[in-house]
Amino acid sequence: SLRMGVKYTLPPLASAPQKKNYQPLFGKSLASYKVTSSDLKGACFYLVSGHGGPDPGAIGKMGSHELHEDEYAYDIMLRLARNLLTRGAKVHIIIQDAKDGIRDQQFLNNSKRETCMGSPIPFNQVRRLKQRSDKINTLFKQDKYAYKRAIFVHVDSRNKGHQTDVFFYHQNKNSESKHL
C-alpha cells in the first residue's frame, strides 16, 4: 500500500520509443543507419544466429585461438540485419547480445550474454529451439507484412574435404518455400 507524503517512482507505461534508423545491437559506431533503397519495403525478416547463451556451437582452433560458432554467426547475422534494414525491410533480431555489436576483429571473444529477445537462453536444446520458434511465431502473427521469412545463421566446423557453403531448409509441400 502507498503512504501519504512518500514520493514514488513509477515505471514507464511502455518501453522508450526506439530512434528511427537506429539499432543499438549493431554497436555504437554502426547503430545509426540510412535506408538507401525501398527494395525490401513490405518484407519482414526474423533473424536467428545459431546457438548462443550457454551453447557456443561448433568450436574450431586457429593457432592458440578458439573460434566459437555462436560469436561468428551472431556477427554475420547482425551484418545481414543492417543490410536488410538499409534496403527498407522490417527486421526482428531474435538472438541478441547488448554488448557485442558488429565486430571487426579476426578473433571474436566468446561470451554467454546472448538472450532470446531479453529472455535467458535455456541450456536444453529442445527448450532452446522451442523458445526461438515461439518468439518467431508470436511476432509472425502480429506482423502484417505480405512477405515474411525466418533466416537461421550457422557457421559449422567442417574439414576441408567436406565443406558445404549453404543449406536451405523449406516446407516440402509449400511451393513458395521451395521457390525461395
PLM features: what roles do these ranges have?
Residues Y8, F45, V166:
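A broad, low-specificity signal marking well-ordered, structured residues that form hydrophobic/aromatic
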Residues S1-N21:
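Extracellular LysM carbohydrate-binding repeats and other cell-envelope/extracellular binding modules
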Residues A14-I59, H65, L78-R79:
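Boundary/activation segment at the start of structured domains
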